[in-house]
Protein backbone atom coordinates (compact mmCIF):
# COMPACT_ATOMS: atom_id res chain seq x y z
CA UNK A 1 0.00 0.00 0.00
CA UNK A 2 1.18 3.53 -0.80
CA UNK A 3 2.54 5.66 2.00
CA UNK A 4 0.15 8.55 2.61
CA UNK A 5 0.92 11.77 4.46
CA UNK A 6 -1.51 14.46 5.57
CA UNK A 7 -0.46 17.99 6.47
CA UNK A 8 -2.75 20.74 7.72
CA UNK A 9 -2.81 24.40 6.77
CA UNK A 10 -5.53 26.51 8.43
CA UNK A 11 -7.28 23.26 9.43
CA UNK A 12 -7.49 22.04 5.81
CA UNK A 13 -5.88 18.81 4.62
CA UNK A 14 -3.05 18.65 2.11
CA UNK A 15 -2.60 14.97 1.24
CA UNK A 16 0.49 13.45 -0.32
CA UNK A 17 1.56 10.06 -1.71
CA UNK A 18 5.13 8.79 -1.46
CA UNK A 19 6.86 7.86 -4.73
CA UNK A 20 9.36 5.15 -3.79
CA UNK A 21 10.98 5.00 -7.23
CA UNK A 22 11.82 8.71 -7.26
CA UNK A 23 12.06 9.21 -3.48
CA UNK A 24 9.68 12.15 -3.27
CA UNK A 25 6.17 13.17 -2.24
CA UNK A 26 3.37 13.96 -4.68
CA UNK A 27 0.77 16.38 -3.31
CA UNK A 28 -2.92 16.56 -4.20
CA UNK A 29 -3.51 19.55 -6.48
CA UNK A 30 -7.16 19.86 -5.45
CA UNK A 31 -6.17 19.96 -1.78
CA UNK A 32 -3.69 22.76 -2.47
CA UNK A 33 -6.27 24.66 -4.54
CA UNK A 34 -8.77 24.29 -1.70
CA UNK A 35 -6.27 25.63 0.81
CA UNK A 36 -5.26 28.57 -1.36
CA UNK A 37 -8.88 29.53 -2.07
CA UNK A 38 -10.08 28.71 1.47
CA UNK A 39 -12.67 26.50 -0.20
CA UNK A 40 -13.98 23.13 1.01
CA UNK A 41 -16.34 22.41 -1.88
CA UNK A 42 -14.80 19.64 -4.01
CA UNK A 43 -16.65 20.61 -7.19
CA UNK A 44 -15.63 24.26 -6.93
CA UNK A 45 -12.00 23.29 -6.37
CA UNK A 46 -12.06 20.90 -9.32
CA UNK A 47 -13.62 23.53 -11.61
CA UNK A 48 -11.14 26.18 -10.52
CA UNK A 49 -8.22 23.84 -11.16
CA UNK A 50 -9.66 23.01 -14.60
CA UNK A 51 -9.86 26.73 -15.39
CA UNK A 52 -6.39 27.45 -14.01
CA UNK A 53 -4.80 24.52 -15.83
CA UNK A 54 -6.24 25.72 -19.16
CA UNK A 55 -4.99 29.26 -18.46
CA UNK A 56 -1.51 28.07 -17.51
CA UNK A 57 -1.31 25.81 -20.55
CA UNK A 58 -2.06 28.75 -22.84
CA UNK A 59 0.67 30.73 -21.10
CA UNK A 60 3.14 27.91 -21.68
CA UNK A 61 3.66 27.29 -17.97
CA UNK A 62 5.86 24.33 -16.97
CA UNK A 63 3.38 23.57 -14.22
CA UNK A 64 0.95 21.70 -16.47
CA UNK A 65 3.61 19.36 -17.85
CA UNK A 66 4.88 18.74 -14.31
CA UNK A 67 1.46 17.46 -13.22
CA UNK A 68 1.23 13.72 -12.59
CA UNK A 69 -1.72 11.46 -11.71
CA UNK A 70 -1.86 9.05 -8.78
CA UNK A 71 -4.67 7.34 -6.89
CA UNK A 72 -5.96 8.88 -3.67
CA UNK A 73 -8.90 8.03 -1.45
CA UNK A 74 -11.96 10.19 -2.05
CA UNK A 75 -14.79 11.11 0.34
CA UNK A 76 -16.71 7.97 -0.69
CA UNK A 77 -13.83 5.78 0.47
CA UNK A 78 -12.83 4.73 -3.04
CA UNK A 79 -9.51 5.46 -4.72
CA UNK A 80 -9.44 7.56 -7.88
CA UNK A 81 -6.75 9.01 -10.11
CA UNK A 82 -6.18 12.65 -9.22
CA UNK A 83 -3.76 15.36 -10.32
CA UNK A 84 -0.66 15.66 -8.14
CA UNK A 85 2.43 17.86 -8.06
CA UNK A 86 5.82 17.38 -6.43
CA UNK A 87 7.38 19.81 -3.94
CA UNK A 88 8.60 22.29 -6.56
CA UNK A 89 5.33 22.03 -8.48
CA UNK A 90 3.31 22.95 -5.40
CA UNK A 91 5.39 26.10 -4.92
CA UNK A 92 4.89 27.03 -8.59
CA UNK A 93 1.15 26.46 -8.20
CA UNK A 94 0.97 28.61 -5.07
CA UNK A 95 2.89 31.40 -6.75
CA UNK A 96 0.26 31.51 -9.50
CA UNK A 97 -2.40 32.51 -6.95
CA UNK A 98 -2.73 36.30 -6.54
CA UNK A 99 -3.63 36.41 -2.87
CA UNK A 100 -1.87 36.93 0.46
CA UNK A 101 -2.80 33.43 1.57
CA UNK A 102 -0.47 31.98 -1.08
CA UNK A 103 2.67 33.56 0.39
CA UNK A 104 1.79 32.31 3.87
CA UNK A 105 1.15 28.86 2.45
CA UNK A 106 4.54 28.77 0.70
CA UNK A 107 6.26 29.84 3.92
CA UNK A 108 4.45 27.09 5.85
CA UNK A 109 5.00 24.47 3.13
CA UNK A 110 8.73 25.06 2.80
CA UNK A 111 9.36 25.37 6.54
CA UNK A 112 7.12 22.75 8.15
CA UNK A 113 9.42 19.74 7.57
CA UNK A 114 12.35 21.50 9.27
CA UNK A 115 10.59 22.22 12.56
CA UNK A 116 10.96 19.96 15.59
CA UNK A 117 7.44 18.66 14.95
CA UNK A 118 8.22 18.01 11.29
CA UNK A 119 11.38 16.08 12.09
CA UNK A 120 9.69 14.24 14.96
CA UNK A 121 6.81 13.22 12.69
CA UNK A 122 9.29 11.72 10.24
CA UNK A 123 10.73 9.72 13.12
CA UNK A 124 7.21 8.57 14.04
CA UNK A 125 6.69 7.30 10.49
CA UNK A 126 10.00 5.44 10.70
CA UNK A 127 9.05 3.93 14.07
CA UNK A 128 5.94 2.30 12.61
CA UNK A 129 7.80 1.15 9.50
CA UNK A 130 10.58 -0.55 11.45
CA UNK A 131 10.81 -3.52 13.79
CA UNK A 132 11.47 -1.13 16.69
CA UNK A 133 7.74 -0.81 17.32
CA UNK A 134 7.64 -4.51 18.25
CA UNK A 135 10.24 -4.01 20.99
CA UNK A 136 8.29 -1.37 22.91
CA UNK A 137 6.83 -2.46 26.24
CA UNK A 138 3.06 -2.12 26.08
CA UNK A 139 1.21 -0.25 28.81
CA UNK A 140 4.25 0.52 30.95
CA UNK A 141 6.10 3.69 31.86
CA UNK A 142 9.21 2.21 30.27
CA UNK A 143 7.28 1.70 27.04
CA UNK A 144 6.11 5.31 27.04
CA UNK A 145 9.67 6.49 27.66
CA UNK A 146 10.83 4.34 24.74
CA UNK A 147 8.27 5.98 22.45
CA UNK A 148 9.14 9.50 23.61
CA UNK A 149 12.86 8.81 23.32
CA UNK A 150 12.47 7.64 19.75
CA UNK A 151 10.19 10.48 18.63
CA UNK A 152 12.28 13.25 20.16
CA UNK A 153 15.79 11.82 20.39
CA UNK A 154 18.26 14.36 19.00
CA UNK A 155 15.57 17.05 19.11
CA UNK A 156 15.15 17.55 22.87
CA UNK A 157 17.85 16.86 25.45
CA UNK A 158 15.14 15.44 27.73
CA UNK A 159 13.88 12.88 25.20
CA UNK A 160 12.72 9.75 26.99
CA UNK A 161 13.30 11.27 30.44
CA UNK A 162 10.66 11.81 33.11
CA UNK A 163 10.46 15.48 34.00
CA UNK A 164 11.86 16.79 37.28
CA UNK A 165 10.02 20.12 37.14
CA UNK A 166 6.35 20.89 37.69
CA UNK A 167 4.59 22.14 34.55
CA UNK A 168 1.27 23.84 33.82
CA UNK A 169 -0.93 24.53 30.82
CA UNK A 170 -3.28 27.46 31.10
CA UNK A 171 -4.80 27.35 34.57
CA UNK A 172 -4.17 23.62 35.02
CA UNK A 173 -1.11 22.24 36.81
CA UNK A 174 -0.11 18.68 35.96
CA UNK A 175 1.12 16.20 38.56
CA UNK A 176 3.67 17.87 40.83
CA UNK A 177 7.19 16.71 40.01
CA UNK A 178 7.89 15.46 43.55
CA UNK A 179 4.94 13.05 43.33
CA UNK A 180 5.33 12.07 39.68
CA UNK A 181 7.37 8.90 40.17
CA UNK A 182 4.87 7.47 42.64
CA UNK A 183 1.93 8.49 40.44
CA UNK A 184 3.42 6.81 37.38
CA UNK A 185 3.82 3.57 39.33
CA UNK A 186 0.11 3.71 40.19
CA UNK A 187 -0.85 4.36 36.57
CA UNK A 188 1.32 1.53 35.29
CA UNK A 189 -0.42 -0.90 37.66
CA UNK A 190 -3.91 0.12 36.48
CA UNK A 191 -5.73 -2.73 34.69
CA UNK A 192 -6.12 -2.66 30.91
CA UNK A 193 -8.38 -5.62 30.16
CA UNK A 194 -11.40 -3.66 28.92
CA UNK A 195 -11.93 -0.55 26.82
CA UNK A 196 -13.18 1.37 29.88
CA UNK A 197 -10.05 0.45 31.83
CA UNK A 198 -7.75 1.40 28.96
CA UNK A 199 -9.38 4.82 28.54
CA UNK A 200 -9.11 5.42 32.29
CA UNK A 201 -5.41 4.56 32.17
CA UNK A 202 -4.86 6.83 29.18
CA UNK A 203 -6.62 9.74 30.89
CA UNK A 204 -4.55 9.33 34.05
CA UNK A 205 -1.33 9.27 32.04
CA UNK A 206 -2.38 12.49 30.33
CA UNK A 207 -3.06 14.14 33.70
CA UNK A 208 0.38 13.00 34.89
CA UNK A 209 2.06 14.51 31.79
CA UNK A 210 5.40 12.80 32.49
CA UNK A 211 7.52 14.75 29.97
CA UNK A 212 8.43 18.40 29.60
CA UNK A 213 7.11 18.37 26.01
CA UNK A 214 5.71 15.82 23.56
CA UNK A 215 3.28 14.12 25.95
CA UNK A 216 0.23 13.95 23.67
CA UNK A 217 2.08 12.65 20.62
CA UNK A 218 3.81 9.94 22.66
CA UNK A 219 0.79 8.94 24.74
CA UNK A 220 -1.53 8.51 21.74
CA UNK A 221 0.89 5.94 20.28
CA UNK A 222 1.11 4.32 23.73
CA UNK A 223 -2.70 4.11 23.82
CA UNK A 224 -2.90 2.51 20.38
CA UNK A 225 -0.36 -0.14 21.33
CA UNK A 226 -2.41 -1.05 24.42
CA UNK A 227 -5.62 -1.27 22.40
CA UNK A 228 -3.92 -3.38 19.76
CA UNK A 229 -2.51 -5.85 22.29
CA UNK A 230 -5.54 -6.12 24.56
CA UNK A 231 -8.54 -5.65 22.26
CA UNK A 232 -7.15 -6.10 18.73
CA UNK A 233 -8.33 -2.56 18.03
CA UNK A 234 -6.79 0.87 17.48
CA UNK A 235 -8.04 4.43 17.09
CA UNK A 236 -8.66 5.90 13.65
CA UNK A 237 -7.57 9.39 14.70
CA UNK A 238 -8.72 10.88 11.39
CA UNK A 239 -12.29 10.37 12.64
CA UNK A 240 -11.79 12.58 15.70
CA UNK A 241 -12.21 16.34 15.32
CA UNK A 242 -9.29 18.33 16.72
CA UNK A 243 -11.34 20.83 18.73
CA UNK A 244 -13.61 18.12 20.13
CA UNK A 245 -10.61 16.02 21.12
CA UNK A 246 -8.80 18.86 22.88
CA UNK A 247 -11.97 19.90 24.70
CA UNK A 248 -12.66 16.32 25.76
CA UNK A 249 -9.13 15.92 27.10
CA UNK A 250 -9.48 19.12 29.13
CA UNK A 251 -12.76 17.86 30.58
CA UNK A 252 -11.35 14.38 31.27
CA UNK A 253 -9.82 15.63 34.52
CA UNK A 254 -13.33 15.70 36.02
CA UNK A 255 -15.42 13.87 33.40
CA UNK A 256 -14.10 11.10 31.14
CA UNK A 257 -17.38 10.59 29.25
CA UNK A 258 -16.57 12.91 26.29
CA UNK A 259 -13.16 11.39 25.52
CA UNK A 260 -14.56 7.90 26.10
CA UNK A 261 -17.27 8.58 23.52
CA UNK A 262 -14.87 10.06 20.94
CA UNK A 263 -12.44 7.16 21.22
CA UNK A 264 -15.21 4.55 21.14
CA UNK A 265 -16.68 5.98 17.93
CA UNK A 266 -13.25 6.00 16.29
CA UNK A 267 -12.24 2.44 17.16
CA UNK A 268 -11.28 0.23 14.23
CA UNK A 269 -10.01 -3.31 13.80
CA UNK A 270 -7.55 -2.20 11.08
CA UNK A 271 -4.62 -2.81 13.41
CA UNK A 272 -2.32 -3.96 10.62
CA UNK A 273 -3.38 -1.31 8.11
CA UNK A 274 -0.39 0.87 7.30
CA UNK A 275 -2.43 3.81 6.05
CA UNK A 276 -4.55 3.92 9.21
CA UNK A 277 -1.46 4.26 11.39
CA UNK A 278 0.21 6.80 9.10
CA UNK A 279 -2.94 8.94 9.08
CA UNK A 280 -3.03 8.55 12.84
CA UNK A 281 0.43 10.09 13.10
CA UNK A 282 -0.57 12.99 10.87
CA UNK A 283 -3.67 13.74 12.92
CA UNK A 284 -1.86 13.28 16.22
CA UNK A 285 0.68 15.93 15.26
CA UNK A 286 -2.08 18.12 13.85
CA UNK A 287 -3.75 18.16 17.29
CA UNK A 288 -0.62 19.86 18.65
CA UNK A 289 -0.49 22.64 16.04
CA UNK A 290 -1.25 26.10 17.38
CA UNK A 291 -4.39 27.64 15.86
Residue ranges of predicted features:
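An anion-engaging/catalytic patch
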Residues: 1-112
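FIC/Doc superfamily catalytic core
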Residues: 95-291
